Amino acid sequence: MIGKEINLLKKYPKTKRDVNKRREEKTEEHRAIARKYGKDFFDGDRKVGYGGFRYDPKYWTEVVKDISNYYELKSGDKILDVGCGKGFMLYDFFKLNPQFNIYGIDISEYAVNNCIESLKGKLKVGNAVSLPYPDKYFDLVISINTHHNLD
């Protein structure tokens, strides 16, 4: 039996930009730079990536509350974010409950090294194919907007 579909991202703010137009403006050179997932992607020009990837509570705070409530997360639970970037969503889990055990993994060494200070040591460089954790270790595993990176 297939479970019911839920949308736990419904409170994530919608973009006001024309995404299709932005996609058309990017050159193959922009895409090649972006695929390195380094400083240019996270904190460089908007045509290459995020255009300055900074923490803003408007993005994940309410989403994290909904996820936590839906899965009935409690103190001590272990949460993994695969494709965590700089760890902004994990930071909001930490703010919601500092007793959550949070872990993140991302392919970008730059993102992991430039994460929010309180997350230092909780994020690792790695990929979704070979996670450096034992099976069934986590109470919740999240991976949002990462499928395009899988080969």
Predicted feature residues:
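N-terminal auxiliary segments of SAM/dcSAM-dependent transferases
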Residues: 1-33
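Class I SAM-dependent methyltransferase Rossmann-like catalytic core
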Residues: 45-58
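Conserved alpha-helix/loop element of class I SAM-dependent methyltransferases that forms part
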Residues: 57-74
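Conserved class I S-adenosyl-L-methionine
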Residues: 76-85
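Class I SAM-dependent methyltransferase SAM/SAH-binding core
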Residues: 88-130
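A conserved beta-strand element that flanks and buttresses the S-adenosyl-L-methionine
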Residues: 142
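Hydrophobic adenine-recognition pocket in adenosine-nucleotide-binding enzymes
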Residues: 146
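A short, conserved alpha-helix within the catalytic core of class I
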Residues: 150-151
